[in-house]
């Protein structure tokens, strides 16, 4: 869990930019969802494999909404498989991994379930298990208290220039 040198609660907004450094994800927009027990990361393709007798998963994500040109392949050791119910009560078995998350200067280990969130606005939900015990204060009126997306995290879209006709 993040440490706070002044022993004060760490304020986070209902949405923040985060990094998942060990997964090679420099920036991803997250929704802090205290109503969700587990954290979830959007993946659009997954495959499991075995490495030295351990179960691993390789998965691909589009970390930015509406930017399918940006694709990141990730690998992590499988921690567990769990049945998770979504807000509509639908049950789904999901792979669970453990990885550090960074929000602003604070970094700590969290568990993430992997699922398809293609139609969702946020590519990642940060559930209450990830923030319990960390002395967080979620401000439901605030957004991006720890900064906007770093400009150089991903390439910008190339602007289409109109050609000069002769």
Predicted regions and their residues:
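Pepsin/retropepsin-fold aspartyl endopeptidases
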Residues: 1-166
